[in-house]
Amino acid sequence: MRKIKIITDSTAGLTLEEAAKWNIDVLYLTVEIDGKVYNPKTDITPEEFMVRMAETKELPKSSQPAIGSFVEAYEKYTAEGYEILSIHLTEKLSGTVNAARQAADMVEGNITVVDCDYTARGQAFQVLKAAEMAQSGDYSVEEIHAKINDIRDKTKLYIVVVTLDNLIKGGRVGRMQGFLGSLLNIKLIAKLTDGQLEEETKVRSNKKVLQYCLNLIKDEPKKIQHLDVVHANGLNLADDFIAESKEITGLTEIPLFFADPVISTHAGTGAFAFMYYTD
């Protein structure tokens, strides 16, 4: 029976139950608020982070896991006879996967590092399938890698930014443009494409946000296998979207998750995202 260990990072948004059930190791990105560094695993909950973020004038900073954390994990599991499949968020948003690659070069053993091209539950889709296949003992690393690449190619991820405050703080939107956007109640809908966030459209009310997002689901030509929703204090939109999407897709379950602090930093208060993969 093959011994394959799946490792990922915290931006995948796995629950503690999922990580335990599938024996997945999670390395945590940290966040810094007003000079103090927090580890989301031990120091701050996603809900607490939203409160702290609202209170600070500066945009919180996120930091990838140290290379030493990857080296430690890789050495531990290779010494126990495991092959390793290490799956991480797109390098367009973080240097995490590059840190993993550098660590893999420093450790002897069969270590495969994957840039999944996504983050949040779009990343989790690949991680959970990889862990399920690894736990069965019936598949090689190459077979698992091929399967998660297939899921990646069939995944779509959209994010709705309802306030431009964090984009202004982060310098992604000019202050005047941000002021006008807030004045006009503009909501930004973006799509993650090839690991890069790109503007999909702008709308001017929550009603139009919901309508646009539901139309994306309605117009999907292939059958949606799995649909997850993530929010950063954006429950109103997320709940309405889930209720309507169940009717459209026939899915009986559409899980809802609170966003990881790193995701919330970029998306801001009130944001929600949905991601799915198809046949």
From Swiss-Prot:
Organism domain of life: Bacteria
A single GO molecular function term of this UniProt record: lipid binding
Membrane-crossing residue ranges in chain numbering: none
Positions bound to hexadecanoate: 62, 94
InterPro entries registered for this protein in UniProt: DegV (IPR003797), DegV_C (IPR043168), DegV_domain_contain (IPR050270)
Sequence ranges assigned to domain DegV in this UniProt record: 4-278
UniProt keyword annotation of Lipid biosynthesis present: no
Classification via Pfam families: DegV
NCBIfam families attached to this UniProt entry: DegV (TIGR00762)
Described function: May bind long-chain fatty acids, such as palmitate, and may play a role in lipid transport or fatty acid metabolism.
Protein name: DegV domain-containing protein lmo1863
